[in-house]
Structure formats: C-alpha cells, structure tokens
Amino acid sequence: MEEFKMTVWTNGKAIRKYTGQDKHPDTNPSKRMEWFKATAIIKPDTGDNNERD
C-alpha cells in the first residue's frame, strides 16, 4: 500500500468527504463557519509504534 493524501471537511465532531469543490458541506450560512478543510497523509503501518501524537 502506498501513502496517499486525503482531504476532508471537519468541524471537530464529524468528518465529511471532500469532493474537490470548495463548497462547505452545510448550506446554512451560520454553520459554514464551523467547518474546516483538513488534509492528511495516510501511510502504511510499518510496525514501528514509537511515533505517538
């Protein structure tokens, strides 16, 4: 498995798929301020558990 980038929308409680469009997942304008775009690099597990957040 290769590493890959994954971009999602998050509000700290939920994660929604980012479809490539810069549109917030909520249509309600007051809720749009709560969503942030986040990008992560997903890497295969190498068995080295020394890295911790």
UniProtKB/Swiss-Prot annotation:
GO terms for biological process: symbiont-mediated suppression of host innate immune response. Disruption phenotype: Knockout of this gene prevents the phage to overcome the host Hachiman defense. Keywords: Host-virus interaction, Inhibition of host innate immune response by virus, Viral immunoevasion. Homodimer. Counteracts the host Hachiman antiviral defense system. This is Hachiman anti-defense 1. It comes from Bacillus phage SBSphiJ4.
